[in-house]
Amino acid sequence: MELMFQDTNEIYNISESIFNKVFNEPLVHQIIVCYLARRRQGSKAQKSRSEVSGSGKKPWRQKGTGRARSGSLRSPIWRSGGVTFAAKPKKYKLKMNKKMYRYAIKSILSELIRQNRFFLFKEFIIEFPKTKILLKKLELINLKSVLIITAHKNTSLLYASRNLYHVCVINVKSINPVILISYEKVLITLSAIKKIEVMFK
């Protein structure tokens, strides 16, 4: 399968076993749900009426005072009382098969290529870590919402993109299904695509 470099107009042969898969939408959805669920901290905790501090004694007698009846200082309707349905720490982790995860990544990458949202560059570098320089470079190739994938951590690109909410720079090892579908277009370097071919072969 052939893909053209955007900076040199040369042709590069990419692996069909990775970049020419049928788009499996139900699988991609399932993997994204699992991925987001695994990122949840699940540490929220509240105290119920049985856990908050306070006396168990009835504040006043049931009848004769003219006041509303009450049985406990720890009642949820009282100030400093417990929470009615107190949240407890919970594990949201869902099972995710490695084979399914890898296929979902391949499926997304293949669909990005089919939709002409995948741009290959021999190299994509900027001289100084300046947002202005990066913006100008992206404007020249008409890219606004873009995910830039490099083979290694690129400090200049990383610093230049930090203040741009529509631009994200990651290295190959940080690829995941959520980030791949979060941007309109994907820009990838030759060294990064070679690493992907090794990782997902």
From Swiss-Prot:
Q: State whether it acts alone or in a complex, and with which partners, per the record.
A: Part of the 50S ribosomal subunit.
* Name used for this protein in its record: Large ribosomal subunit protein uL4
What is the species listed in this Swiss-Prot or TrEMBL entry?
Answer: Buchnera aphidicola subsp. Cinara cedri (strain Cc)
Provide the organism lineage as a comma list: Bacteria, Pseudomonadati, Pseudomonadota, Gammaproteobacteria, Enterobacterales
Keywords associated with the record: Ribonucleoprotein, Ribosomal protein, RNA-binding, rRNA-binding
Q: Which GO terms describe its cellular component?
A: ribonucleoprotein complex; ribosome
Question: Which family does the record assign?
Answer: Belongs to the universal ribosomal protein uL4 family.
Work out whether the entry's keyword set contains Transmembrane: no
Q: Region Disordered: which residues?
A: 45-75
A GO molecular-function descriptor: structural constituent of ribosome
User: Its function?
Assistant: One of the primary rRNA binding proteins, this protein initially binds near the 5'-end of the 23S rRNA. It is important during the early stages of 50S assembly. It makes multiple contacts with different domains of the 23S rRNA in the assembled 50S subunit and ribosome. Forms part of the polypeptide exit tunnel.
Q: Does the keyword Nucleus apply?
A: no
GO biological process: one example: translation
Please, which domain of life does this record's source organism belong to? Answer: Bacteria
